[in-house]
Curated annotation (Swiss-Prot):
The gene is pepD. One of its GO terms (biological process) is proteolysis. GO terms for molecular function: cysteine-type exopeptidase activity; dipeptidase activity. Keywords: Dipeptidase, Hydrolase, Protease. The active site is at C3. Gene3D superfamilies: Penicillin V Acylase, Chain A. Optimum pH is 7.0-9.0 with Ala-Gln as substrate at 37 degrees Celsius. Activity is very low below pH 5.5 and at pH 10.0 is about 50% of the maximum. It catalyses: an L-aminoacyl-L-amino acid + H2O = 2 an L-alpha-amino acid. It comes from Bifidobacterium longum (strain NCC 2705). It is an enzyme of class 3 (hydrolase). Pfam families: Peptidase_C69 (PF03577). Hydrolyzes a wide range of dipeptides. Highest activity against Ala-Gln. Disulfide bonds: none annotated. This is Dipeptidase.
Length: 533
């Protein structure tokens, strides 16, 4: 899918969390209604068959519970996209990437071949449709996520280029597929953020580490031979670090319209003073091929920053389709980040300063990001609110997805007259979300604790927040974490908080719909009343 990703290391985030976020955008001319659900172990398939590639995979018999954001219409498969499992591992899959002819000539995609005559069908490999479902329920750390997906890619191959993010409370990993069977993965530096449009992004890779200690790099076992045999390393000097973007990626004319401008705008917003971003003497321009994969921000990155950049339509530049700078040519020159065919945005935040059972948050938004809101939900629950889960293929304002689609369609043609109402809605619901998280954290923190335990926990949390150093207020092994999350009393509290959030969200969304519908109705061209005379 045509998506946009941002990853934020724990030392770059505002609260010491790891944060992974991605817009899921549908193909041009398509709109995919989405559902936010919990998949219980008994609901997880043991024999999985993909719709697109007709591939059947036998899955392990011990899946973890996890959240997902599948399509409401399953005619093209599940497309689970984003979730957190009960080991507090988050996964976002996938960011569709570009490649080049040299890579595909050396390792072709594994594509489905239909039956023809006496020849039986030949299943294809795995793809975005499948990734979350066949990986997230079976991993207990972010690193394990990379290892499992890498093994599946090597065994079954893939029919498309994809980027996938994994996170736990300690680290974030970014995996990029290479051709049909190869892959690379890099740990996001703790002090940095990563911006990813639909283009292979990693621009420096330590093969020695990937094939050795794997401290910050991993890859398919034969990657060094694959690179050498197929002359993929384009470095002029032997001492130059290996650049996967040059070797495996693309620098096409379409990239300069569709991809590089998005990375340029996100980094321009998060590092406005590091370099010159505009004009003929800019260090990086919207069409630059060397915009860094990772960068240290000038200040800590917040949830609101993430929502802003993933809603971007190039505000403050001549490229804003809703702006007054530039002209009609420049305003439609580049593909915006906040686009009409956005399906959903999931932001997964894993907070090391909270108890294991409630440290994960999955922030959710549906529809076109410039006109929607991002609100928090706790994934460690047995059910999700109907307002976000019960999305149908029928248009109705009774669920969050379609309400947002209707609001966006109304606001797009009257951006200036509706923008104040949208901004007030976003601010109010965002504040409600932060307030609800804080109240729920307090409730969980005091659950069943003695006075002495309360004092000790408060001291630990204050020390963590004050020092902002590596640490965990409740360090546990993965299996201990899973046991802690399977606390029915905690899950009941978190589910109640989620329902409260959904109820308040529905009320505010309906108010916004009423407001923008009134504004658009008053602007109709067939309006007429006697006071006109």
């Amino acid at each position: 899918m045509a998506c946009t990703t941002i990853l934020v290391g724990k030392d770059a985030s505002y609260d010491g969390s790891t944060i992974i976020a991605r817009n899921e955008d549908s193909a041009n001319g398509e709109f995919n209604p989405k559902r936010f659900i919990v998949v219980k172990p008994e609901e997880q398939p043991r024999e999985y068959k993909s719709v697109i590639s007709h591939l059947t995979i036998t899955l392990p018999d011990d899946p973890l519970q996890y959240t997902a954001v599948p399509n409401a219409d399953l005619k093209e498969g599940i497309w689970g996209e984003a979730g957190v499992n009960e080991a507090n591992v988050a996964m976002s899959a996938t960011e569709t990437l570009t490649t080049n002819e040299r890579v595909l000539g050396a390792d072709p995609f594994v594509e489905y071949t239909p039956a023809k005559g006496d020849e039986p069908e030949v299943p294809g490999g795995i793809g975005e449709e499948d990734f979350l479902t066949i990986v997230l329920p079976y991993v207990k750390t972010a690193r394990e996520g990379v290892q499992r997906l890498g093994a599946l890619l090597e065994e079954f191959g893939t029919y498309e280029m994809n980027g996938v993010a994994f996170s736990d409370s300690n680290e974030i990993w970014w995996l990029e597929t290479v051709g049909g069977h190869h892959w690379i993965a890099k740990r996001v530096p703790d002090e940095a953020y990563v911006t990813m449009p639909n283009q292979l992004g990693i621009d420096e890779f330590d093969l020695e580490d990937a094939l050795g200690d794997q401290e910050a790099h991993m890859c398919s076992e034969d990657l060094a031979e694959f690179i050498e045999t197929n002359h993929l390393d384009l470095a002029v000097e032997n001492t130059t670090p290996f650049n996967p973007r040059d070797a495996f990626g693309s620098h096409s004319d379409s990239d300069h319209v569709y991809n590089t401008p998005r990375a340029w705008y996100m980094q321009r917003f998060l590092n406005p003073y590091d370099e010159v971003w505009d004009g003929p003497d800019a260090d990086h321009k919207p069409t630059s091929d060397d915009i860094p994969w990772a960068r240290q921000p000038e200040r800590k990155v917040t949830i609101e920053d993430i929502k802003y950049v993933l809603s971007s339509h190039y505000q403050g530049t001549p490229f804003d389709p809703y702006g007054q700078l530039g002209d009609e040519r420049t305003r439609h020159m580049y593909r915006t980040i906040g686009i009409n065919r956005q399906s959903q945005l999931a932001v997964m935040q894993i907070r090391p300063y909270r108890p294991q059972a409630s440290r994960a948050i999955q922030w959710m938004a549906y529809g076109s990001n410039p006109f929607n809101t991002l609100v928090p939900f706790f994934p460690n629950v047995d059910t999700t609110p109907a307002y976000l889960e019960d999305t149908t293929t029928r248009v109705t304002s009774e669920n969050f997805y379609w309400a947002n689609r209707i609001i966006a369609a109304l606001c797009d043609g009257a951006f200036r007259s509706t923008s104040n109402a949208v901004e007030r809605y976003q601010e109010k619901t965002g504040a409600m979300g932060h307030r609800l998280v804080a109240a729920t954290d307090e409730q969980i923190a005091r659950l069943g604790l003695t006075a002495a335990e309360e004092a000790a926990q408060s001291a630990a949390e204050e020390e963590f927040e004050a020092d902002n150093v590596d640490g965990d207020v409740q360090p546990m092994t993965p299996d201990e974490t899973i046991a802690a999350l399977r606390n029915p009393e905690v899950r009941e509290i978190l589910a109640a908080a989620n329902q409260t959030m959904a109820d308040q969200l529905k009320e505010e969304t309906e108010k916004l719909l009423d407001s923008v519908l009134y504004t658009r109705s008053m602007e109709m061209k067939n309006g007429f009343h006697m006071s006109d005379f």
